[in-house]
Amino acid sequence: MTIRKQHHWLTLLAVLMTIGLVVNSANTATAQTKKKPNIVLIWGDDVGWNNPSAYNRGMMGYKTPNIDRIAREGALFTDWYGQQSCTAGRAALITGQSPFRTGLLKVGLPGAKEGLSIKDPTLAGLLKNHGYMTGQYGKNHLGDRDEHLPTNHGFDEFFGNLYHLNAEEEPENEDYPKDPEFKKKYGPRGVIKSFADGRIEDTGPLTKKRMETVDEEVNAGALDFMDRAVKADKPFFLWWNSTRMHINTHLKKDSKGKTGLGVYADGMVEHDGHVGEVLDKIDELGITENTIVMYSSDNGAECFTWPDGGSTPFRNEKNSNWEGGYRVPCVIRWPGVIEPGSIHNGIFSHEDILPTILAAAGDPDVKEKLMKGYNVNGRDCKVHLDGYNLLPYFKGEVDESPRKEFFYWTDDGNLANLRYGRWKLVFMEQRAHGFDVWQEPFVTLRLPKLFCLRTDPFERADHEAIGYGKWRFERIYLLVPAQAYVSKHLATYKEFPPRQKPGSFALDQVLEKLQEAGTSGR
């Protein structure tokens, strides 16, 4: 063979090899696209709407580049609703049901009997039907007992704490009873490691000192979970729940003074660094294009604990009926589905995540199935989902969010407000501020207050606008449509009633039990 012919054949071989590599690469990309998406839900705790710099635009003097990256590569939502407190917000997301329906409205305390029922399926359990590995890392706050642990509700594994941080550190209070029996009965459990096969390990108390680095422990476990899922070639669902930024913030030495703006800003920067570690791991594993990433928080900002407290431009704060108690930051990256850099102003809520994710996993009719009765990870379940499937909207198949309304339930189980479209009607209002919102009762109004959340998103008109009374009076016609929304929603509780009564910080339930016991004894 001549040198020229040899060169010709070598060139042809190189071309064929290149074509083969391109075809093989295309096939690999197609296979990756066809895989069920991985889901990573990253949650802060009590992080205010205004705390990520994607929302505050740097006006708070620090940056959260990793949370901002999710917004830049995905979408930012201005009107995303959590709930009024920790337990309710987490229950809404993981069950897709109104927390009034699950009875998980009141903040869970050590020793409390209320918790997530096995009759209420979770996003994790439903994804097990589709072959997912499921892991929850970080704060749970959906019940104190073993039966309430995530690993009894669809998660393969769990590592985290069960309550808010200030409850975890109560045993270190100088007046805390020294009697071991008191702590055993009423004290917080430690940081729990559990598995779906029934193994449960208490890894020790979440002390003030451990709080400095517990999120690092949690993050290490979460990264390892993703590693193992990818090696097993299985789609995975990771719910990563930070302890930041709930009070009380205890920072390690390296995190203190980072911003020069105090403990909350320093904590947010540390927290954002943990978010960055998760995003970097997703990149390292080569699964970025097939992984949905959401960042959000459970409830509105807790402002009364400032300077160790969140920030929101909205009225009032956590545990009130006002927007400040319910609006949360939310950014979602979903390659190939959500347009990068987009901003969405429609109404959305945590309840919508479950049906949306299930649709992405190949189960768009899960809501209808569950209403008729559906086997979820080996359990027969029949429930009413209150969330909406957002996938057609995210794909651009419809122009608006399917959610047109949002119901604001108080932690006592009362319907305080309704939002439909741009209108918000207030049936009960919290007139207290600061810590007193946890103490003072809501005031029931004979005629609802009215707000337009487009022209008055911060609900200032009723106490600042000279013409508010006339404006409100001229729009009484909005009341009957609001009643129709409420009637339709409440009608669903006839077939699917609340699972349990929400807990109580007062004596009403104790007195009720005594009355029931007295009646039954007659």
Model-based region annotation:
Residues T2-R4, L10-P448, L453, P457-R522:
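Formylglycine-dependent sulfatase
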